[in-house]
Amino acid sequence: MGASVTTGLQMAAARPCIPACQRLLGSRAALPSFGRALSTQTGFASCRKTASAGPFVSLNHKRFAVRAMSAQGLPIDLRGKRAFIAGVADDNGYGWAIAKALAAAGAEILVGTWVPALNIFETSLRRGKFDESRKLPDGSLMEITKVYPLDAVFDSPEDVPDDVKANKRYAGSSNWTVKEVAETVKNDFGTIDILVHSLANGPEVKNSLLETSRKGYLAAVSASSYSFISLLQHFLPIMNPGGATISLTYIASERTIPGYGGGMSSAKAALESDTRVLAYEAGRKGKIRVNTISAGPLGSRAAKAIGFIEKMIEYSYVNAPLQKELLADEVGNTAAFLASPLASAITGSTIYVDNGLNTMGLALDSPTLST
């Protein structure tokens, strides 16, 4: 069972952080949300250049990291709740941060890890590699009750092609399709209360949409959006009424982000649309709330496959209303709120956690503003 915080979670401002132009974020996550401010021409300018962009940008700015801490106040109390987080494969991404926040609020944590990454993840846990990042606000370590092998691209054993079955990266693992994992969780624990989808993959993400193959496009949609539908299909029967589901999306669902291709923008748009439809269906069928978080850029291992994540981190810092580093914990805290009774009337919503970058319609680092 994850450690409980009897006084709940409360937000507090921590010490100023180093500007992104001096230190780029190096934590890990699944494919991130990047922002929606419009860039022009070359698009990404350094902080030095942007400081001379006229009256739009202040020369003297500080940023503060907002972290959760245990203190007296309105509590996020998830004691007695059980969460399944799909898509945790390391200790620095959004999925991990969400797991920590839920654990800090008292929830029991189960995770689903991509089969080829399972051995490394479990070995790292056993050897204490993640102990520092497992620390909760009360000083205890987050406990993961069980790690399940999972490949959410496949709904049932009948869907798994022979080449995957024969792949040595899947050797030694079993019962890892969505249907099998849901059945195993039911056999192990009976029910869950919180379902988190932290999964995304676009094999052709570096390709423009015009250069994306049908196979690559459909693979992106399958792994990044339909996987959520499949998870909810199979886990809904074992979710307690009043439970919640949370997924992670990206502003490319609404705005053009050159470089985020391969059908990933379409997949995120589908995920947000599905969030609204599933909010109705799961709400009526199981009294389950369905929301998605549109998070800002995070320098994850997966995101680095896109090729320009560090520039997007800097771009976000320069152009967002709040000029501060976006922490994975801030996304985790939002997820804990959405999973809690405090958000009991919120469903079908896309919640932006990006320092406000989604509100911007002008890129302050545009070369045109410096002339």
Swiss-Prot record:
The active site is at 250 (proton acceptor), 260 (proton acceptor). It is found in: Plastid, Chloroplast. Keywords: Chloroplast, Fatty acid biosynthesis, Fatty acid metabolism, Lipid biosynthesis, Lipid metabolism, NAD, Oxidoreductase, Plastid, Transit peptide. It catalyses: a 2,3-saturated acyl-[ACP] + NAD(+) = a (2E)-enoyl-[ACP] + NADH + H(+). Transmembrane segments: none annotated. It is an enzyme of class 1 (oxidoreductase). The keyword Electron transport does not apply. One of its GO terms (cellular component) is chloroplast. CDD domains: ENR_SDR. One of its GO terms (molecular function) is enoyl-[acyl-carrier-protein] reductase (NADH) activity. Its EC number is 1.3.1.9. Residues 1-67 form a transit peptide. One of its GO terms (biological process) is fatty acid biosynthetic process. NAD(+) binds at residues 87, 94, 151-152, 198-199, 248, 268, 298-302. Pathway: Lipid metabolism; fatty acid biosynthesis. The keyword Cell cycle does not apply. Pfam families: adh_short_C2. Homotetramer. Belongs to the short-chain dehydrogenases/reductases (SDR) family. FabI subfamily. Catalyzes the NAD-dependent reduction of a carbon-carbon double bond in an enoyl moiety that is covalently linked to an acyl carrier protein (ACP). Catalyzes the last reduction step in the de novo synthesis cycle of fatty acids. Involved in the elongation cycle of fatty acids which are used in lipid metabolism. Required for normal plant growth. This is Enoyl-[acyl-carrier-protein] reductase [NADH] 2, chloroplastic. It comes from Oryza sativa subsp. japonica.
